[in-house]
């Protein structure tokens, strides 16, 4: 064997070792549907923002809880699969998914045309709207009242994406025609409370629940926006078509059994199941 062939053999061997180490961690590279793998391992990893109440968050006791946590656990219980919850940087969620670090994105994840280029979606299971939360004392009661005011938004959120995609709705009014970006909504709400920003573009479901839990919702005002209503969906790799089908099937089964409603009433006091 020549030195050249030996070198090529070594390089190929190293490549195979690296590829083997990645194994099923990079499922997109394999280009296969992974449902049988999830069934065999009886485990699936879901990425989420562990500050996004009431959808999925870390409680004071350190447990992961929330509407999406309960719903996902119920969905995969239908198939005898346990869920491993993996906190992630929400701004990197699609990268984490397609790199194989997580198997699903599930945490108040809105369906958008831009995201559809990167991931596959389940059917919608809940609807949501973007609002601007302001302090009642500020007398900011409309979008036009935000003229020259400082706006906050979460990086990578659907609200921030809409803010940039449709500048005539809100962006043209706010100070500097830009939003102060935050890693979490919790951080942004703290700044709103302390008057470091004048308004916060946020998911209505999050704001309503969070401020009610804080016991001071009357101190805040919800400004409606003209952004299109959103559908909450689960995001998967495009190769995982059977996984999508199984989740959609479980949504219907849980609703037919009344289990979806039970989870919904626990967190929202009503049935939020999407009819779409």
Sequence positions of predicted segments:
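C-terminal motif of bacterial Sec signal peptides marking the signal peptidase cleavage site
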Residues: 18-21
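Flexible hinge/capping segments at coil-to-helix
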Residues: 37, 134-151
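Periplasmic-binding protein-like
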Residues: 50, 127-134, 204, 212-252, ...
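Ligand-binding cleft/hinge of the Venus flytrap
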Residues: 58-59, 72-81, 159-181, 211-216
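Short helices/loops that flank or line small-molecule/ion binding pockets
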Residues: 86-87, 91-104, 118-120, 144-147, ...
């Amino acid at each position: 064997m020549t030195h050249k062939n030996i070198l090529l053999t070594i390089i190929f061997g190293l490549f195979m070792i690296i590829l083997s180490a990645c194994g099923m961690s990079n499922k997109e590279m394999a280009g296969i549907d992974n449902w049988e793998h999830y069934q065999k391992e009886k485990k699936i990893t879901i990425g989420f923002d562990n500050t996004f109440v009431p959808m999925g968050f870390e409680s004071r006791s350190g447990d992961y809880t929330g509407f999406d946590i309960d719903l996902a656990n119920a969905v995969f219980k239908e198939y005898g699969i346990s869920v491993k919850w993996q906190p992630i940087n929400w701004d990197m969620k699609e990268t984490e998914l397609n790199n194989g670090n997580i198997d699903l994105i599930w945490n108040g994840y809105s369906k958008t045309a831009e995201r559809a280029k990167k991931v596959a979606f389940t059917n919608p299971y809940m609807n949501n709207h973007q609002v601007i939360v302001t302090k009642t004392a500020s007398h900011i009661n409309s979008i036009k009242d935000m003229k020259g005011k400082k706006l906050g938004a979460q990086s990578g959120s659907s609200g921030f994406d809409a803010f940039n995609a449709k500048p005539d709705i809100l962006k043209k009014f706010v100070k500097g025609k830009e939003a102060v970006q935050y890693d979490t909504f919790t951080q942004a709400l703290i700044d709103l409370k302390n008057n470091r920003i004048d308004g916060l573009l946020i998911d209505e479901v999050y704001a309503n629940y969070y401020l009610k839990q804080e016991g001071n919702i009357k101190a805040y005002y919800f400004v409606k926006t003209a952004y299109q209503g959103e559908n909450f969906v689960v995001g998967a790799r495009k190769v995982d078509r059977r996984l999508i089908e199984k989740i959609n099937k479980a949504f219907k089964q849980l609703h037919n059994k009344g289990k979806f409603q039970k989870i919904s009433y626990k967190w929202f006091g009503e049935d939020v199941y999407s009819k779409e």
